[in-house]
């Protein structure tokens, strides 16, 4: 299973914000510059993260973006659930004629649940705490 670039960059943006001193604002432009991502793409990602309460966006001259809640409370699995379409196969009747008797869908759903359960063991704080090499790469100290 490969995460979409939308989810990948969403996780990266959250990691960047979690690496900053607590409560410090950043900008979408700063995040896009760090990762070399399209601003339009990042705006969509930040909007979805904001709607989910994971990012707080403040408008105005002194505005910016920051984590919407403490990094210790943001589980990686929850971020993936929010950003990633987790349907591995299309099991609609018009697409697949064995849907009524197929057991593969259940197996794949269980695999996704196991994947998410594993991701739920880690928080955003786990990704950034005591990680000087990360801070150096992101140019935050």
UniProtKB/Swiss-Prot annotation:
DNA-binding region positions on the chain: 28-51
InterPro entries referenced in this protein's UniProt entry, alphabetically: TR_Rrf2-type_CS (IPR030489), Tscrpt_reg_Rrf2 (IPR000944), Tscrpt_rep_HTH_NsrR (IPR023761), WH-like_DNA-bd_sf (IPR036388), WH_DNA-bd_sf (IPR036390)
HTH rrf2-type domain sequence ranges: 2-129
Role according to the record: Nitric oxide-sensitive repressor of genes involved in protecting the cell against nitrosative stress. May require iron for activity.
UniProtKB keywords: 2Fe-2S, DNA-binding, Iron, Iron-sulfur, Metal-binding, Repressor, Transcription, Transcription regulation
UniProt GO molecular function: 2 iron, 2 sulfur cluster binding; DNA-binding transcription factor activity; double-stranded DNA binding; iron ion binding
HAMAP family registered for this protein in UniProt: HTH_type_NsrR
GO biological process: negative regulation of DNA-templated transcription
Required cofactor(s): [2Fe-2S] cluster
Positions with a binding annotation for [2Fe-2S] cluster: 91, 96, 102
Oxidoreductase found in the keyword field: no
Pfam families given in the database record: Rrf2 (PF02082)
Protein name: HTH-type transcriptional repressor NsrR
GO cellular component: cytosol
């Amino acid at each position: 299973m490969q995460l979409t670039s939308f989810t990948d960059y969403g996780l990266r943006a959250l990691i960047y914000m979690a690496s900053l001193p607590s409560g410090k604002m950043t900008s979408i432009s700063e995040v896009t510059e760090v990762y070399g991502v399209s601003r339009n793409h990042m705006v969509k990602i930040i909007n979805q993260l904001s709607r989910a309460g994971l990012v707080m966006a403040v408008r105005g001259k002194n505005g910016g973006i920051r984590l919407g809640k403490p990094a210790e409370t943001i589980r990686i699995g929850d971020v993936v659930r929010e950003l990633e379409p987790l349907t591995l196969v299309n099991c609609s009747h018009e697409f697949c004629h064995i849907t009524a008797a197929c057991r593969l869908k259940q197996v794949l759903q269980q695999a996704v649940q196991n994947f998410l359960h594993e991701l739920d063991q880690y928080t955003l704080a786990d990704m950034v705490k005591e990680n000087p090499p990360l801070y150096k790469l992101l140019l935050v100290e």
